[in-house]
């Protein structure tokens, strides 16, 4: 079977109504990562997800990026067939401000939001992110 094209993937996923699987917090809409993962597995069970990171001071590869000020971003990529999309997010507090030296729980929560947002780059729930890039 032929690998799906970006247009085919977008055509399938962008038509799915995610509205019953979102939650509003602090002025932003969040899509349930577990529900989003289930949809992706229903349609593309062979998708690949990877985390990018950097070497720490001991030479160990970490799946986060730590900036000189102590803030952290997570970066992931999702590949379906030959189509890859990437997304990144800073680890933030409830005010949507980057956290200095975040704990493992904050990093884990951000990773789940990051891959869910990466799914939006394929079409799943893309419309819930409209306007988040507009300055306040």
Please give the residue ranges for each predicted region.
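N-terminal, Lys/Arg- and Ser/Thr-rich interaction peptides
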Residues: 1-38, 135
């Amino acid at each position: 079977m032929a690998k799906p094209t970006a247009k085919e993937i977008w055509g399938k996923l962008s038509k799915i109504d995610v509205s019953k699987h979102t939650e509003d917090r602090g002025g932003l809409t969040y899509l349930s990562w577990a529900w989003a993962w289930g949809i992706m597995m229903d349609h593309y069970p062979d998708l690949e997800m990877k985390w990018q990171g950097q070497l720490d001071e001991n030479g160990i590869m970490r799946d986060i990026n730590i900036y000189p000020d102590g803030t952290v971003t997570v970066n992931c990529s999702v590949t379906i067939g030959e189509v890859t999309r990437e997304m990144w997010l800073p680890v933030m507090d409830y005010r949507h401000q980057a956290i200095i030296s975040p704990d493992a729980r904050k990093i884990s929560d951000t990773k789940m939001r990051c891959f869910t947002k990466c799914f939006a780059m394929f079409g799943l729930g893309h419309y819930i992110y409209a306007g988040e890039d507009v300055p306040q």
